[in-house]
Each structure stands twice: as C-alpha cells, then as structure tokens.
Amino acid sequence: MTDALLPANLNAKRLSEQNYFRKGKSIAQTGRSKLQNQRAILNQQILKAMRMRAGAENLLRATANNKIREQVLLELSFVNSNLQRLKEELERLNISVEVYQHTEQASNIPLIPLGLKETKDVDFTTAFKDFILEHYSEDASEYENELADLMDLRQACRTPSRDEAGVELLVSYFQQLGYLENRFFPPSRNIGILFTWYDSFTGVPVSQPNISLEKASILFNIAALYSQIGTRCNRQTKIGLEEAVTTFQKAAGVLNYLKETFTHTPSYDMSPAMLGALIKMLLAEAHECYFEKMILSGIQNEFCTLLKAAQEAAKVSEVHMQVYTLMNQAPIKENVPYSWSVMVQVKAEHYKALANYFVAITLIDYQLNLSDDEDKQEKAISQLYDSMPEGLTAQTILKDQQQRTLLGKAHLSKAIRSHEEAIRFSTLCSTLRQIDVLQLILSAFHQRSLLKFSQHQKPDDFLDLLSAPDIVSKTEYQAETIPPQLSKDKVTDIFQRLGPLSIFSVKQRWSAPRKMCITKEDGDFGFVLKGDCPVQVISLDPLCPAATEGLKEGDYIVSVAGKDCKWCSTSQVMDMLQETGQDSIEIQVISIQDQTNSLANKSATYYAGMQKTYSLVCLTMDNDKNTKTQKATKKLSFLSWGFKNRQKAASTICLPSEVKGKPKTDMVFSFPDNSLSTESALY
C-alpha cells in the first residue's frame, strides 16, 4: 500500500485510477462468491420472516379475541417453521467446506473456515456533503471524486479476493475508517448514516449509526478471510502446511484483537464468548496442520519417534475436545452451527484414534536391538502415561514381548472404538454425511486399524482383560495468536484535501474561508507565521494593513494567491508570499469556531424487525448540571434491556437511562493523535 505522504498535487488522480481498491471479485466469479450471494439472499429472507414473527407476536398480545388468537397462533407456527428452515439453510452454507479446500486435498479432513459477514449498502454522499459544508465550511461538490472512491472501496470490500491482496483491501478500508471516524463522526451527535451488518451465524441484522460497528465487522471479515486462505492452502506440501499454520494463527490474532478492543459488540458472532470459541477453533486447526506437516513425509519407524507422534496426535485431539466443550456451552450452543460442533467432535475422536494406533504399532512391531538406547526408550514409555497399567513397569514393557503385545492390542482396540465413534458422530449429522472426503478418510483409517488388529488376533483374545490407559498429550508446538499488523502500511487518506487530520477533524469546527489582500509595509507584512500544515498567524501588528483587512491573530492560512497551502510548512508559505515579487497578495484564512455543546443524541443498536431492542450506550454532554450532586444509575446491558421492554411495541426503540455522575471525559470519544485509533466510546 502507499504511504500516507503529502502528494505534490492533491487533485492529480482519483484513488480508483491508481488501482487503490481494484482487488474485489465479482459477486458471480467464484464458487465462494456464489455462496456469499446466497448468504445475502438468505439474510434478507430471514429479516422478512423475523418482521412477520414480530408483527404476529404484537397482534397476539394486543387482541383478546379467541378466534383471532387461534389464526395468529397458526400463522406464527408457519412463520417459525419457515424461519427454522432458513436458519438451517444458513448453517448449510457455513459448513460448505468443500468450496474452500484446495483442489488436490483428497486425503485430508476438511478444515472449517469462517464465512464473511454480509452488509447493506451505505450512502455516504448526503451526510458527508452536509458535514463538509457545515463543519469545514467548504464546497462539498468539490469532493465528489473522494465520495465515489469511498463508496467503491466499501463495495469492493464485500467480495475481497481470497489472497493477501484481499486482506490488504480490507485492512486499507479499516485504516480509512480510522480517518473517517476522526473527520466525520463527532461524539456529540449522529450524522445520519446507519450501518447494517448481518450476523454470520444467525443471519439477524444489526443496525447502528456508529462507525464502530463497521470497524468491528471489517475486523471479523479480515479474520474470516485469513481462515479461508488457510483452508485453501495445499496441505500436501510442507510449504502449504506452514502457510496454513501461520494463516490460522493470524486469523485467531485478528479475532483476539477484536475481542479485546470492542468489548460490548451488538451481534452474537462478535460476542466475547463466541469469539473465544472461534479463536480456540482456529488455533486447533493450526495445531492440526502442524501435526499434518510432522507426518507428511512419513514417520520414521523408530520407537521414540512413533511415541512422539502419538503424543502429538493426542494433543490435537485434546484441543479439539476443548473447542467442542466451548461450543456446547450457552449461549454459544444456540448460535454456532450444529455441524461445526459435530465436526470438531469427529476430529477429537479421529486424532485420539490415531494416537492409540501409533502407540499400538510401536509396541506390537517393536524389536529390541543391542544398539537401542534403553534408557531413552524407558523414559519415553514412562512419559506416555500418567500412571502405568496395573502390574507393569516401563522396563517390563520393554523386556517382555508378550506383555508389550497385549498392551499394544489394547491400544489398537481403543483406536478402533474411537474410529467407530468418529464415524457414528459424522453419520448423525446430515450435513457431514454429504461430505464424501470426510467419510472416505474416516472409513480408510478405520479399516487400517481393523486390518492391523486382525493380523494379531488369536482365538483366546477374549481372555485378555488388559485396558489401555489414556495417552498423555505432549507437543513441541505452541499455538499462539499472531497480532494483526493493521498499521504496518499506511494508506492515503481519501479526504486528505480537507487538510492535516491533526487539525482538520471533528474536534475543531472551522469558519468559512475569508479572502483578503495583504500589503507589505516597509518590506514586512506585519505578522509572524508558526507551525506546519497549516501555518498559523501570530504576533500580528494591530496597525498593519493585514489587520485592517480583517486578519486576526490565531488565523490559519489555507491559500496563497489561489494555491492551496493546508499541507505546506512555514518556510513553504513564506516562499509563496515572497515569490510573487509584489507588495500585495491575496490569501485565504480560516479560524476555529467555538464548539457549542449540545445534548448528545442517544445511540441505540437494534435488530431490525425484532421485538427486542439492544441498547448500548447513551452519551450525554449536559454541562448545565452539577455532576457531583447526581447519583449514578446502573446501566443495563444491551441484552437485559431488550428483555425488560418486552411489553413495548416492536417499533419503539427503547433506551436506558443515561449514565449520570460520570466525569465529562468519560462521556465523549477520545481522539488520540493516532488517526487510526480503534478506541470508541460506543464499544
């Protein structure tokens, strides 16, 4: 991406002409895009069904006529049935893993990618034009190109390419949102722009007039895109598996950043509990790819190496079981796709079976050689279990071929049971039954274990009562999140012509430019300039011609002889004033206007068409009251508030009492010097 440097000509080219965002894919170009298109259609159908259900529930509460109530209840049952069908369709899209896998991956269990969140179109034109005219006192018609670039950039972000270029596109838009937040979104009021995003799992729309929802959703999509890239990596090569491990760690890192930065998100897919489960799932998939890399070229038929592979497989099983446990806790269980939790459970059993299989072939096929390091092998066995089988020691297992074989067959029997459990779980889910690759892999590994068991089966095996203990998981790989590099490559601020962001932001309101002709007197204009980008007038001689023309101390010079100088340094402006060679020159100046604090508009997040209203934060800037004498009112969470107002009409946006007694600094947004700050009072 390009650096955020001052261009020589701010009007030179539109960003679209510089290939700034030509990285989005057409909605019908790829199978993945077709799935995303189907998701958008389903989201609209879910929204319609939820509105119908909300209307029916309102009518049910409003009427006492038994006949009408019976008709409404019948209609409500049809609506709920249709809504359930639509959500099952959405779940089917979420588990359409074949589209995301590499074309040559016919011997790997499919990985689970995250789907991109869908959004509705947003028209920035009217609101931004009004704000430019009102706040910056500039002709908004001169920013048509910038507005068009912004709209095109957002549209391109809806279908990013599944590669690093697509990630760069989303990151660049996220950085632009940081600029936009500081230029156009004052903390004291809403400017009339409503952002709507659909929940990735439930399809429920969430609307909010705050840019923080946009930023959080883009972060979620960056993580989703990383997960899709990781899923697409070629897992038949070492390089492909290493790339998959790194990419899944990056995806988990973005979600972790989202979880820590936006702590009160309005949709279920970005709630802390759900994000925690998704992070665990992505790291489990990274661990899975690491294990596949470890056994890619085959496992050396060596005692300690095989036991090490067994413990690595046990670790993969363990992390997937942890993910399964998280996915079966409320409220995650109600929102995560059922097929996802079953897939995770299948993987947990599958890798548990692999761990027992590796131990089994190690014990059964092992032959003691004089060159073997017995101490090392004995240590490996002692670290394999928390407690040794009854009556056995590590040395006994090494020395006694019969006991070693019996223990190996016990592990083999345990592997077969785990394979059968994995197959049973996969057949219980209709969606997983249709994934042919998964069924073939599970069946092949099951048959391999059965074949190995049959080779060592004897008629009196039913007398062997030895039970294989659980394998202690152990790994040399630590699956950790990789923090996102969201500010690594600075992008060009689309609205940089408004001026440097440190000065021309929502924090300062500017007067309209004032034209004046200043004249030298005794070779001097009668004032001093300071600062850079833009320069400020100080030490103004009240008797000089410039003061007579209306120049005031503290004014900022934005134009000299018709040339924009908002981005010019003091020396550059001085050169512009002197280079004309004339005693008089025309300049334009602006001054900061007093900020009039008014009561901030209350901002509510709500689910369109739903009876519940999810209110987040009410901002206030009431300076007339003494905050020391006010009592703090407990602020309700956005979920509890919706339940409290069940009896109110669906069309009413319910807002909690404003938080009193807080310092003024806690009630407004903070805008640090970094224009890409993701801090937001709403989140």
From Swiss-Prot:
SMART domains: BRO1, Hr1, PDZ
PROSITE patterns reported in the protein's UniProt record: BRO1, PDZ, REM_1
Main location: cytoplasm
Keywords: Coiled coil, Cytoplasm
Keyword NADP: no
Subcellular location: Cytoplasm, Perinuclear region
Gene Ontology biological process terms from the UniProt entry: negative regulation of stress fiber assembly; signal transduction
Origin: domain of life: Eukaryota
Family note: Belongs to the RHPN family.
Function: Binds specifically to GTP-Rho.
PANTHER family noted in UniProt: RHOPHILIN (PTHR23031), RHOPHILIN-2-RELATED (PTHR23031:SF5)
Protein name, per record: Rhophilin-2-B
Chain's gene name: rhpn2-b
